């Protein structure tokens, strides 16, 4: 039962969607920020 609960929590629609959205937005913002910082340093 505990494993099922954990699996349900980890495999829930909201957490997965949030994680996916964050992962999709994070890399882009991080790359953009890094590129901007690199350009500013140059």
UniProtKB/Swiss-Prot annotation:
Claim: Transcription is one of the keywords in the record: no
Regions of compositional bias (Basic and acidic residues) in chain numbering: 21-36
Cellular localization per UniProt: Spore core
GO biological process terms held by the UniProt record: sporulation resulting in formation of a cellular spore
Induction statement: Expression is sigma G-dependent.
Region of interest called Disordered, as start-end residue ranges on this chain: 1-42
Disulfide bonds: none
UniProt keyword Transmembrane present: no
Alphabetically ordered keywords of this record: Sporulation
Name of the protein in its database record: Small, acid-soluble spore protein L
Lineage: Bacteria, Bacillati, Bacillota, Bacilli, Bacillales
Gene name in the database record: sspL
